[in-house]
Amino acid sequence: MTYNELKSEENKYVMNTYGRFPIALDHGKGATLWDVEGKKYIDLASGIGVNCLGYDNPIIVNAITEQAHKIMHASNLFTTEPMVQVAKKLVEKTHLNGKVFFANSGAESNEGAIKLARKYSFDKYGEGRYKIVTLINSFHGRTVTTLKATGQDRFHNYFFPFTEGFDYAVANDFDDVRCKVDDMTCAIMMELVQGEGGVLPLDPAFVKQVEALCREKDLLLIIDEVQTGIGRTGSLFAFQQYGIRPDVVTMAKGLGGGVPIGAVLAADTCCNVLTPGTHATTFGGTPMVCAAANAVLDNVGDPKFLHEVKQKGEYLKNGILALGKDSIHGVRGMGLMLGIIVDEGKHSAYANKLIENGVLAITAGKNAVRLLPPLVISKDEALSVMAKVF
């Protein structure tokens, strides 16, 4: 079908919940995509950080195919080998000595972390200690609870009443965080690079102070690595570059390399809090998606691969800055999670212009063109187009 034919059918049958770009994607290879009209695009979005190993990668395709011939789904009333393997790899590669709960998305993973934190506190201190401090400009999901955890007022509409129990502090302002913590607080939850908020890395000194506060007050430190995790920043998880030890790490996006999976990794401080009957999901940890996740971790977890991600990120960042364009006010981020800073309100226009020139990019915050390419992208694939656009 042509784009116009597909769009007509979409308008008729699909809920209008997304502001879509005017293209219909058909297939891909590596870091390149083609639409239904045959136009070629360099992908700097990777499905919002999902397709970490690119498209038609035999590593992923073979893992999924082989597992599909065995068993695609099994109830969590039974044990399956791919699930156990993924959990073991996550625990061993993070040195948190904990355990994993599997979910289907980032929002579900964050919901699980919120439940875990509240039960941890309930078990130790009883009722009344349930509040969680998050950061202004954060994003933690689109369920009724994770929307409320999100520190952006524009998301707090329509769906009243939201889940109570969230306070918001200014990022990189430790005094404000300390002021927001009281006797009813059970956890602090943060993204180390605020993705939807504008690709804003947190200050390492601030993060260390927050960790120390959590230890002082017996609060769980929850690090939302839904977007930063699985090699995106040049380490398997961003917290490893900050030198901290979280109690809980949430993840999704790149973990499945293109198939839906999320996970809650709890350290030894709290990994036995959730028990039978307190949390569950039908599809979490199903064999086929875990087969894909195993393939991803075997490759992205390689130190050489992660070093190359850092190198590519620096090369792309420096190459963009070297263009010397007045329209570019800076580039921020870590690894291959970058934001090109432009005039406020102009980021969507630049993203559209990139698409016209055969590059897929997305936006973040009020002034960032967000780059989240497949981690396998070559160094030079995107730079040639940037000069035409900015």
PLM ranges: what are they?
Residues 1-390:
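Conserved N-terminal phosphate-binding loop of PLP-dependent enzymes in the Aspartate aminotransferase
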